[in-house]
């Protein structure tokens, strides 16, 4: 099994592109935007359902393993769909995906992904490259994009506070790409794959786009036991945050 160090951004991009060509009857490949360092952000749609659920990973370069796993999951789902297999003798994948398709975006922040793998010299823009080097952060611990911004906390919410020059809500290309695709597609749900304890702050609007709602999404990757042990402390934290609600209304952002 390849590790994240063996999986290049280009390999991830082309694996999704090739999957769409091979399984063209029920998949669609799309570039939803470009990063500040001019890398394309790919998305693979699986299934033919009218409703969709977004599966997103790679907000931070340090979440490279989640990017790799989500890519593998997408390819495996394509194979299962084509063969019309039933998973665990319970889940009819083809039937489910023909009702609700998956929109998989495994690498939202391709610049950060490449920086963690190859170092700051992989940044093409010389100004961005020099600014990042001046921050004196080890490349394998770097969590931002090519401009040094945290894309997971760049969405227009009450949590988005300006900490750097030129930083405003939705100031980053990666953030705007997600907002556009969420607004275009709507959606029935959002799954964010990220490292333990990390949070992605995103916004949500009703279909008429008049009233904003804000939700805190996090994918902690805990075991069920650990989740139960931490339930009390988690509840205390959520009292000060917007409530997490599962609704059938379209989700229009992450």
What do the predicted segments below correspond to?
Residues 1-10, 15, 19, 23, ...:
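C-terminal accessory segments enriched in acidic
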Residues 26-34, 140:
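Short acidic, Pro/Gly- and aromatic-enriched capping/linker segments at domain boundaries
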Residues 42-50:
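Short beta-strand-to-loop junctions in surface cap/lid or active-site-entrance loops
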Residues 50, 64-66, 70-211:
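Active-site/substrate-binding loop(s) of hydrolase catalytic cores
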Residues 52-55:
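Conserved beta-strand elements of the Class I
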Residues 59-63:
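A generic structural motif
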